[in-house]
């Protein structure tokens, strides 16, 4: 029995060193809607496959609706596997990446031999399925990947430093770029809650009936490249997401040279400043602020300082920067897993494993 365990560990170490293992990214079924958090998971999987790792998308049901085609070129080659198919095989040398919302999946996978890591993109979802009084550490999880330093600090403090978090910021694809055509009197709007969108445009048309020819465009559910093209032709982007911790949509707008008018979220994004957007803490004022900006746009008198501050952000959060962080952080996680497995070997076996590695 002891020899079997030794052989298993040595085999797992060898496979990790040779990249002969799988990284499963568990995702929710968005029914084909391309939401930013799931798109970011696909980006991690795509980059890891480019680096030679066997990254796969893991979902619960056989009838999962993939979003790969809506993300653009390079995503449709990512393999998908469902739990329902009963074809999932997980080994000691494999990894499962679980979004923060799925505490139930963390509990269900607690006895699997693989390394499990939580992917925190929205701190507000941490408690969604977490049983009161329970911690991720109760399910054997102590490692987290997140998207910002603020969220890293929040998670580590929340779990009393028993969780170690690594930061890989979100990237904004290159197809988010300024349009070569004049902007249209269209306001692109993205809200987490559909009711916020309805309240904003109804209040706007009620308060300013002379601007009824201005169009509001709901940006949710569009394929990514269509989303980017539609955003770039707008004269203004409106963003309401109180529990956002990163702010992907406003960054996409800024990269497209479209000013953002938004409600400051509870966890203020690290990139946000008083001068790089039209920010407010009062949701009631959003319709009035839209009208004020629209009047300035018609008169070609938008604040130039706003555009200058937007320019400073345009080179940030690139795909190249994210790829570097993915390479670094996942490489670190894999090496730590190797060391963890070696620590479970007797001394003579550790020396043997080190000699094999050399």
Language-model region placement:
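C-terminal "capping" alpha-helix adjacent to the active site of nucleotide-linked donor transferases
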Residues: 282-303
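Short acidic/histidine- and often glycine-rich active-site loop of Leloir-type glycosyltransferases
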Residues: 265-279
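Extended catalytic core of nucleotide-activated donor transferases of GT-like folds
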Residues: 6-10, 56, 64-141
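A short, glycine/small-residue-rich beta-strand->loop->alpha-helix junction that serves as a flexible
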Residues: 28-40
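Short hydrophobic beta-strand element within catalytic cores of glycosyltransferases
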Residues: 259-262
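Aromatic "clamp/platform" in nucleotide-sugar-dependent glycosyltransferases that forms part
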Residues: 242
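A charged, aromatic-enriched C-terminal amphipathic alpha-helix characteristic of glycosyltransferases
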Residues: 298-354
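Conserved catalytic-core segment of nucleotide-activated headgroup transferases in glycan assembly
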Residues: 37-40, 153-227
């Amino acid at each position: 029995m002891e020899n079997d365990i030794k052989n298993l560990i040595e085999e797992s170490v060898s496979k990790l060193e040779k990249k002969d293992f799988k990284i499963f990214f568990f995702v929710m079924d968005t029914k084909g809607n391309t939401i930013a958090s799931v798109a970011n998971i696909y980006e991690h999987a795509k980059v890891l496959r480019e680096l030679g790792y066997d990254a796969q998308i893991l979902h619960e049901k056989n009838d999962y609706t993939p979003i790969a085609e809506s993300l653009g070129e390079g995503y449709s080659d990512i393999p998908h596997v469902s739990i329902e198919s009963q074809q999932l095989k997980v080994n000691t040398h494999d990894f499962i990446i679980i979004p923060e919302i799925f505490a139930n999946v963390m509990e269900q996978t607690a006895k699997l031999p693989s390394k499990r890591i939580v992917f925190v993109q929205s701190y507000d979802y941490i408690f969604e399925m977490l049983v009161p009084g329970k911690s991720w550490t109760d399910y054997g999880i102590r490692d987290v990947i997140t998207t910002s330093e603020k969220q890293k600090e929040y998670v580590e403090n929340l779990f009393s430093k028993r969780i170690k978090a690594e930061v890989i910021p979100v990237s904004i694809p290159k197809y988010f770029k300024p349009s070569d055509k004049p902007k249209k009197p269209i306001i692109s709007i993205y809200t987490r809650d559909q009711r916020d969108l309805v309240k904003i445009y109804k209040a706007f048309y009620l308060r300013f009936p002379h601007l009824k020819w201005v169009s509001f465009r709901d940006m949710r559910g569009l394929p990514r490249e269509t989303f980017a093209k539609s955003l770039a032709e707008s004269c203004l982007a409106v963003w309401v997401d109180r529990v956002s911790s990163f702010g992907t949509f406003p960054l996409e707008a800024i990269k497209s040279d479209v000013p953002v008018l938004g409600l400051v979220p509870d966890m203020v994004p690290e990139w946000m400043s008083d001068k790089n957007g039209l920010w407010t803490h009062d949701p009631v004022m959003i319709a009035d602020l839209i009208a004020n900006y629209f009047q300035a746009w018609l008169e070609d008198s938008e604040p130039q300082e706003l555009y200058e501050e937007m320019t400073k952000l345009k080179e940030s959060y690139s795909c190249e920067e994210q790829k570097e962080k993915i390479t670094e952080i996942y490489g670190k996680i894999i090496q730590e897993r190797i060391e963890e497995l070696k620590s479970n070997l007797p001394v003579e076996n550790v020396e043997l494993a080190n000699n094999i590695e050399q």
